[in-house]
Amino acid sequence: MVREKVKVSTSTRTRQWKCVESRTDSKRLYYGRFILSPLMKGQADTIGIAMRRALLGELEGTCITRAKSEKIPHEYSTIVGIQESVHEILMNLKEIVLRGNLYGTRNAFICAKGPGYVTAQDIILPPSVEIVDNTQHVASLTEPIDLCIGLQIERNRGYGIKTPKNFHDGSYPIDAVFMPVRNANHSIHCYGNDNEKQEILFLEIWTNGSLTPKEALHEASRNLIDLFIPFLHTEEENLHLENNQHDVTLPFFPFHDRLVKLTKKKKEIALKYIFIDQSELPPRIYNCLKKSNIHTLLDLLNNSREDLMKIEHFRIEDVKQILGILEKK
């Protein structure tokens, strides 16, 4: 466990955040406590409420969402040679904590032979996913039988609730909890005199191990920034001069000319054969582009600056980073 003394900055200009306590209670329970100061009266509550909602509702997680086996007649049946009922096995699979960056649906498998215990380490996963706690229990095989279960893995946010219509062909949906943050609280400490009251915001974050509290804090902050960016662009896109009927649109980026020149420069190269996963892009940017059906550098350069900024969770800094990578090609 790491704990630091809280030092209050006397400056009213520079806000600083700091991790003042960090500990790992188990493989599936991380804790972190952070401070942000100095803040004016009322600002701590504004930030604290927004951060808590973003931490609990905006972050994505990876979960097992479906299990399939042709030998299972229904969810509440039992199988000879397995101590747990099918329902109990599904509940155990629901508790498996996964860490990974993936887009869409991926398949995984459990293939085990009894007698013995089946744990999370027996799950065969795609390369982009890993298990946080390999010791998590799945089933107990009491006889020399083969247990083969097909699994479906997805990345999403919030809750995934199963519905009766999703039961078919020996396939059983699993109620998924995609939230990597188990809990988040904020508290406020006031200091200073009545004329110059200031606040310190304390944030406490508990995660399931798929993210550290610090990673969760960074991701929630980025998501909040992305949510507010459209409000900044609206004025820039629709600026009207008082004595002129023509719209004047401010450029999105000062470096748009670089994008135009780069497109011309690369015209002779077979960009359609260079895929974006060869360009050393960070996972978040890569996933944003894939979701928008941008698979090659040619796809990317055929998008205008406006098109790129319409991509969900995409930021101006991401375009700068992409340009830097492309100019090296």
Curated annotation (Swiss-Prot):
InterPro entries cross-referenced by the UniProt entry: DNA-dir_RNA_pol_insert, DNA-dir_RNA_pol_RpoA/D/Rpb3, DNA-dir_RpoA, RBP11-like, RNAP_asu_C, RNApol_insert_sf
Residue span of region Alpha N-terminal domain (alpha-NTD): 1-235
Domain of life: Eukaryota
Region spans: Alpha C-terminal domain (alpha-CTD): 269-329
Entry's free-text remark on domains: The N-terminal domain is essential for RNAP assembly and basal transcription, whereas the C-terminal domain is involved in interaction with transcriptional regulators and with upstream promoter elements.
Summary of subunit composition and partner proteins: In plastids the minimal PEP RNA polymerase catalytic core is composed of four subunits: alpha, beta, beta', and beta''. When a (nuclear-encoded) sigma factor is associated with the core the holoenzyme is formed, which can initiate transcription.
Record protein name field: DNA-directed RNA polymerase subunit alpha
Naturally occurring in which organism (per UniProt): Gossypium hirsutum (Upland cotton)
Lineage: Eukaryota, Viridiplantae, Streptophyta, Embryophyta, Tracheophyta
Recorded name of the encoding gene: rpoA
